Amino acid sequence: MDIRTLALFSILLGSLCLSEGKPVSLVYRCPCRYFESNVPKSNIKHLKILSTSNCSLQIVARLKHNGKQICLDPKTKWIQEYLEKALNKKVKT
């Protein structure tokens, strides 16, 4: 192998090692980009509350009738009440 081929191979190998893991676009993407605000509480099977350093409070709900996951607006009144009750329960225990 000549020196140019070896140098090129080393550079390519180095760039592969640096690109391991998730692409930058996936690392910083928040799970919720759109929020639903008019979903009745009775249509929700369960909620997941997500909070990451890169994203604001994210609330993901699974719907009863079709199992679809949607993101709920955390500013919705019934969600704020739900979160307040959940936090109060956690503080008491």
Curated annotation (Swiss-Prot):
Main location: secreted
Pfam family, one: IL8
Leader sequence segment: 1-21
Keyword Cytoplasm (UniProt): no
UniProt site positions, description: Important for dimer formation: 46
Regions that span the bilayer: none
Cysteines paired by S-S bonds: 30-55, 32-71
Ranges for region Receptor and heparin binding: 29-33
Binding site for heparin: 41-51, 62, 69, 85
UniProt-listed GO biological process terms: cell chemotaxis; defense response; G protein-coupled receptor signaling pathway; immune response; integrin activation; mesoderm migration involved in gastrulation
Subcellular location: Secreted
Gene Ontology MF terms: chemokine activity; growth factor activity; integrin binding
InterPro entries (UniProt xref): Chemokine_b/g/d, Chemokine_IL8-like_dom, CXC_Chemokine_domain, Interleukin_8-like_sf
Annotated segments matching region Receptor binding: 48-50, 60-64
Quaternary assembly: Monomer or homodimer; in equilibrium. Dimer formation is induced by non acidic pH and the presence of multivalent anions, and by binding to cxcr4 or heparin.
Function description: Chemoattractant. Activates the C-X-C chemokine receptor cxcr4 to induce a rapid and transient rise in the level of intracellular calcium ions, and chemotaxis. Signaling with cxcr4 mediates the directional movement of mesodermal cells during gastrulation. Binds to the allosteric site (site 2) of integrins and activates them in a cxcr4-independent manner.
Annotated protein name in UniProt: Stromal cell-derived factor 1
Annotated organism of origin: Xenopus tropicalis
